[in-house]
């Protein structure tokens, strides 16, 4: 019998959907709706760690009246939510909202939801390590508290637009390139649509 069994590390993955969307778009990744988010999470967790939670945060579009742009965005979000919540992806989707101001949409409430969930997870000992895919520096106070509680936080960003504030405050940093994420682009789904 093994006298020193090594405990499997528990990992929770938190994705800032809007932040990731624009980073993938910058890299010319196609068909972002059907990107293999679950496989990306699996790769980031790596061997010897167990994913205990996968959360995807996004501002929800509310189409009002004859707003055709909002209606089209809403239809795209429904497809995205269905994909994320499918058995193969297994994400818990957390919604903020989008506010339209002067014709431009602004996401509201998402960073607060991420910060609260990170902190609740740390306080309730739900994970050993949080993997955060976001470049939002508003999350730094939550990150600092998580570290103070003895948890690890891995910042996953992109080499073309890293967040130096998150790099400085995270326990570990991984900056992805287009080559790192190309394998998660769902080309087959793109051909069907």
Question: Can you say where each PLM-predicted feature lies in the sequence?
Answer:
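Domain-level signal for Mg2+-assisted phosphodiester chemistry and nucleotide/NA-binding surfaces
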Residues: 1-106, 152
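Nuclease catalytic cores that cleave nucleic-acid phosphodiester bonds
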Residues: 82, 86-193
């Amino acid at each position: 019998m093994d006298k020193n069994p090594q405990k499997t590390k528990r990992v929770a993955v938190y994705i800032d959907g809007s932040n990731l969307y624009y980073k993938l778009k910058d890299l010319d990744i196609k068909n972002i709706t059907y990107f293999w988010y679950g496989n990306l999470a699996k790769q980031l967790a790596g061997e010897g760690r167990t994913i205990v939670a996968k959360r995807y945060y996004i501002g929800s579009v509310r189409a009002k009246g004859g707003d055709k742009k909002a209606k089209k965005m809403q239809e795209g979000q429904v497809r995205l939510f269905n994909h994320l919540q499918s058995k193969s992806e297994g994400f818990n989707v957390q919604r903020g909202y989008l506010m339209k101001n002067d014709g431009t949409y602004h996401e509201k409430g998402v960073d607060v939801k991420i910060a609260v969930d990170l902190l609740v997870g740390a306080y309730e000992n739900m994970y050993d390590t949080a993997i955060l895919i976001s470049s939002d520096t508003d999350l730094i106070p939550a990150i600092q508290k998580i570290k103070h509680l003895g948890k690890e936080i891995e910042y996953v960003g992109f080499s073309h637009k890293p967040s130096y504030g998150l790099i400085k405050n995270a326990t570990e940093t991984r900056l992805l390139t287009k080559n790192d994420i190309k394998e998660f682009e769902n080309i087959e789904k793109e051909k069907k649509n």
